[in-house]
Curated annotation (Swiss-Prot):
It holds the Pfam family 7tm_1. Disulfide bonds join 124-204. It is found in: Cell membrane. The keyword Transmembrane applies. Belongs to the G-protein coupled receptor 1 family. The chain crosses the membrane at residues 53-73, 88-108, 126-146, 167-187, 218-238, 270-290, 306-326. Keywords: Cell membrane, Disulfide bond, G-protein coupled receptor, Glycoprotein, Lipoprotein, Membrane, Palmitate, Receptor, Transducer, Transmembrane, Transmembrane helix. This is Neuropeptide Y receptor type 2. Residues 74-87, 147-166, 239-269, 327-381 are cytoplasmic. Residues 1-37 are annotated as: Disordered.
Length: 381
């Protein structure tokens, strides 16, 4: 996650000078920032064809992410029947991804292509903080969704999280994430680095207290990896394994209740896919960052910058994948998306699939009578 900040020493050669990435969220690579003065030092990211591919990749992610996540937020706000607790959490994921798409990725692409920080000191502190914040909010929200569904389905609890409490949980998620990401904004340095005599570049690097290779950066990096990736995914995995086992072994007493049970399975399956996409897309970048934290010689790889950029692009794909999953795997979102594009408020078509009708309430009562109760809003989106 967040690596140790470094500064260029006057005795270092061009080949030795490295600049650290942003930290949790990794909006920029640690590769050389300066245009290399000698041809043999040019890395692949400076090749025209590679730059074209990077521009197309980042622009596609930004476009798909902005459109898809904006659409998710729009339908949850517009259609009353979509305003369930689970959908509020899903909309919160969309807000976090939208933050990355609009505030982080454009500057990341610019930084990668230009080789130095041209966006000023304010954004030097703000951009890495924003992406670290967004990633942490996403992780916390996915964990909350998993625990809520586990509570309702595995333990047969009737009481659900109220809409008011869901907003409180969302606020706490942002507040806690803001505190955890704050070192990314505080321990940041906007400075000039002399590459060779009479040649300087503007760098935006981590600057931790103490010596040049401070232990604080490594501690923060590994702690963030454990607390904000490994531990949450462990909790989420256990929760969904238990949920899936419960649903698989449950015997429905009637046709109506069987339909309700099937909808629970479909919703759970969709949310599991969301978690898998998030975990898999971020895994290469986290693994690569862990390798750097363990052995700083990884920074000396000629294609370090290209490897980092490829892994970063893979991680950023998670910011537009969720809306595609919703449209593909959930009929409510699919109908809501189509209605939004047609500028029609077809609440009747959407409501027929949401457990807010008398039929759904009847299904809930049947579930209660057979010891398998679940929140209507917690099991349907």
């Amino acid at each position: 996650m967040g690596p140790i900040g470094t500064e260029a020493d006057e005795n270092q050669t061009v080949e030795e000078i490295k600049v650290e990435p942003y930290g949790p969220g990794h909006t920029t690579p640690r590769g050389e920032l300066a245009p290399d003065p000698e041809p043999e030092l040019i890395d692949s990211t400076k090749l025209t064809e590679v730059r074209v591919v990077l521009i197309l990749a980042y622009c596609s992610i930004i476009l798909l992410g902005v459109v898809g996540n904006s659409l998710v937020i729009h339908v949850v706000i517009k259609f009353k029947s979509m305003r369930t607790v689970t959908n509020f959490f899903i909309a919160n994921l969309a807000v976090a991804d939208l933050l990355v798409n609009t505030l982080c990725l454009p500057f990341t692409l610019t930084y990668t292509l230009m080789g130095e920080w041209k966006m000023g000191p304010v954004l030097c502190h703000l951009v890495p903080y924003a992406q670290g914040l967004a990633v942490q909010v996403s992780t916390v929200t996915l964990t909350v969704i998993a625990l809520d569904r586990h509570r309702c389905i595995v333990y047969h609890l009737d009481s659900k999280i109220s809409k008011q409490n869901s907003f409180l949980i969302i606020g706490l998620a942002w507040g806690i994430s803001a505190l955890l990401a704050s070192p990314l904004a505080i321990f940041r340095e906007y400075s000039l680095i002399e590459i060779i005599p009479d040649f300087e570049i503007v760098a935006c690097t981590e600057k931790w207290p103490g010596e040049e290779k401070s232990i604080y950066g490594t501690v923060y990096s590994l702690s963030s990896l454990l607390i904000l990736y490994v531990l949450p995914l462990g909790i989420i995995s256990v929760s969904y394994v238990r949920i899936w086992s419960k649903l698989k072994n449950h015997v429905s007493p009637g046709a109506a209740n069987d339909h309700y049970h099937q909808r629970r399975q479909k919703t759970t399956k969709m949310l599991v896919f969301v978690v898998v996409v998030f975990a898999v897309s971020w895994l290469p970048l986290h693994a690569f960052q862990l390798a750097v934290d363990i052995d700083s010689q990884v920074l000396d790889l000629k294609e370090y910058k290209l490897i980092f950029t490829v892994f970063h692009i893979i991680a950023m794909c998670s910011t537009f994948a969720n809306p595609l999953l919703y449209g593909w795997m959930n009929s409510n979102y699919r109908k809501a998306f189509l209605s939004a594009f047609r500028c029609q408020q077809r609440l009747d078509a959407i409501q027929s699939e949401v457990c807010v009708t008398g039929k759904a309430k009847t299904n809930v009562e049947v579930e209660k009578n057979h010891g398998a109760a679940d929140s209507a809003e917690a099991t349907n989106v």
